[in-house]
Amino acid sequence: SGCVVIDNEAGSHALVRHLAARGFRKIAIITTFPHLPTMELRHRGYLRALAEAGLHADPRLYGEVAYAGYRQHVCDTLDRILAMVPDTDGFFFTTHILATEALRYFHDRGIDISDGRLGLACMHEDPLFRLAAPRMSVARFPVEEISAHAVRLLLRQIRESQSPGSVRPAPESVVLPCRMEFRDE
């Protein structure tokens, strides 16, 4: 067996480091399923980038969204963060689904995201972002490479299962980098 994953920590770190380099100082993280290794790595990248930029990881800027009823939870989470830290100037979304709901929230509340005063960054892309948030930086997943490696690993697994008595090699894990797109420059 084996697996193909993206480098979640490096992608998150690069996005948040970019926001900090652009001068954003109060960068919130909006996440879900914090117990999953993927989300843990994304959170770790966020924290590491803040620390390297000399920024305090303010717990009031941490937004955890429950999956069930996530549309309302995103609104409630953003309401809470903006009430506690009204000068929040950046948002890092750990998934494109959370970012999409946040864009709806910003639109519904008349929060202008087009002028660059709010830094926006997201792990993964949604075609909507180019229209609704063209300045949102994203870590694009290399879908074609992921597919190619997954097929290669699957074919290897099939070959090995058809060779009785053969020595099974150790499972192979492939970690691929994200393609960073800093769109606010």
What are these model-derived regions, one by one?
Residues 79-185:
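Flexible loop/turn connectors
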Residues 3-14, 30-77, 92-101, 122-126, ...:
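Hinge/beta->alpha junction and helix N-cap segments in small-molecule ligand-binding domains
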Residues 24-26, 89:
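Short acidic/polar active-site loop segments enriched in Thr and Asp
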Residues 26-27, 57-61, 112-119:
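Short acidic capping loops at alpha-helix termini that bridge into adjacent secondary structure
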